[in-house]
């Protein structure tokens, strides 16, 4: 059996209508598996809850909602349940990054993921953005193109997916025995690449038109931009292949196009140099990451969100590799880390100056009031991995419980 699953990238750090929207905004169904929150004594303000100025944005705390694909945007449109999901997690002065959003028809590769290349999509996102802004949140939209991580079924007119290479992603046997397999791709011609760059530029403009405060360009987890960046995939012999400078050329052209369109103070970038997701790896991730960080600093990129190498547990405790120091020291803008962080490790990372902000995925999807739970040192709801990528507009999406009012 061949099965397509939703994007694994967004939950690494861990990215119809709702008839009862007004009710659900204030009360959510408690999953049977979720613990009843029991508040512990408050303590002095923790590092994660101290303010931070990110360019023009004055953030009240450092707990960031990571971009998380959830496969619930039917027909590539965010609907009322999506509005509810983000508004539940919005806080005054808190930064949320919306799920990976396609820049064009050819950008799609997974079921029920949103886009922002049409007027209808822009208007649909506007209602979501308005709901977040009404609660004082700062809202960025992650924009992407999946490249070879697609099948002909998701491409316009059944055409072949278009990455930097003709190499196909190796089929993967999933835990349930099914197989994840992508279609054989067609290498982009050099003369086609400017159109993809322009798609990102237009998407950035559309995000601002929809009301977003900025965009995060997805240069991570094995999707199109990273496919160009990493030598484990990029086998081109033109100006977009070979040296690090050539392999990063496409990424920097996209970033520059977005900056030219909406300003560097509204552009963030996500990188995962150590990841090998989707057969996308590099022989020298340190050099690759450093090259990108230095170039992004020169361009005045607002923030860089970087993903830790694989996190392990020792005696039940999360062990963060802390391998991003050299990138943090070089980057001139706001630095965001992600990848396995909990409350304790997040506080440690901020207090030691390792990062400015910490992005949370799985814990934020399961705890809509995560900053408050961190403040009170309250127990966290357990996330249900089986509902990460299902299409239900409520279960595993908007029904995770809040803490009881004090």
From Swiss-Prot:
Residues of the active site: 223 (proton donor)
Q: What is its EC number?
A: 1.3.1.-
| GO MF entries | FMN binding; oxidoreductase activity
Which enzyme class, named as a word?
A: oxidoreductase
- Which residues are involved in binding FMN? 67-69, 100, 142, 270, 340, 361-362
| A Pfam family reported for this protein in Swiss-Prot or TrEMBL | Oxidored_FMN
Required cofactor(s): FMN
Role summary: Putative oxophytodienoate reductase that may be involved in the biosynthesis or metabolism of oxylipin signaling molecules.
- Protein known as: Putative 12-oxophytodienoate reductase 8
Q: Which gene encodes it?
A: OPR8
């Amino acid at each position: 059996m061949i099965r397509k699953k939703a994007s694994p990238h967004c939950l690494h750090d861990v990215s119809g209508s709702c008839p009862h929207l007004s009710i659900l905004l204030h009360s959510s169904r408690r999953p049977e598996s979720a613990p009843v929150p029991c508040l512990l004594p408050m303590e002095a303000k923790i590092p994660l809850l101290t303010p931070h100025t990110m360019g023009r944005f004055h953030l009240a705390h450092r707990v960031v909602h990571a971009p998380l694909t959830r496969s619930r945007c039917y027909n590539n449109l965010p609907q009322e349940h999506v509005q509810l999901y983000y508004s539940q997690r919005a806080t005054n002065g808190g930064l949320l990054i919306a799920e990976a959003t396609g820049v064009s028809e050819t950008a799609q590769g997974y079921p029920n993921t949103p886009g922002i290349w049409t007027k209808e999509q822009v208007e649909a996102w506007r209602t979501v953005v308005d709901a977040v802004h009404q609660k004082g949140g700062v809202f960025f939209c992650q924009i992407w193109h999946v490249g070879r991580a697609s099948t002909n079924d998701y491409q316009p007119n059944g055409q072949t997916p278009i990455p930097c290479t003709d190499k196909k992603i190796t089929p993967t046997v999933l835990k349930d025995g099914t197989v994840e397999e992508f279609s054989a791709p067609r290498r982009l011609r050099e003369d086609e690449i400017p159109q993809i760059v322009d798609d990102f530029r237009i998407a950035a403009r559309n995000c601002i038109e929809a009301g977003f405060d900025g965009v995060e360009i997805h240069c991570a987890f094995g999707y199109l931009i990273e496919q160009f960046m990493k030598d484990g995939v990029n086998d081109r012999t033109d100006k977009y292949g070979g040296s690090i400078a050539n392999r990063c050329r496409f990424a920097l052209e996209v970033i520059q196009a977005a900056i030219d369109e909406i300003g560097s103070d509204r552009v963030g970038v996500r990188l995962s140099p150590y990841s090998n997701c989707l057969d996308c790896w590099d022989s020298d991730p340190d050099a690759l990451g450093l090259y990108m960080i230095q170039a992004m600093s020169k361009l005045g990129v607002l923030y860089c969100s970087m993903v830790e190498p694989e996190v392990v547990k020792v005696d039940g405790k999360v062990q963060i590799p802390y391998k991003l120091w050299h990138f943090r020291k070089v980057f001139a803008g706001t630095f965001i880390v992600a990848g396995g962080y909990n409350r304790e490790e997040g506080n440690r990372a901020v207090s030691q100056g390792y990062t400015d902000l910490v992005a949370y995925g799985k814990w934020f999807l399961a705890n809509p009031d995560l900053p408050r739970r961190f403040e009170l040192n309250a127990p966290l709801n357990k996330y249900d991995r089986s509902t990460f990528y299902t299409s239900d507009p409520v279960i595993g999406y908007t029904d995770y419980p809040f803490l009881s009012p004090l």
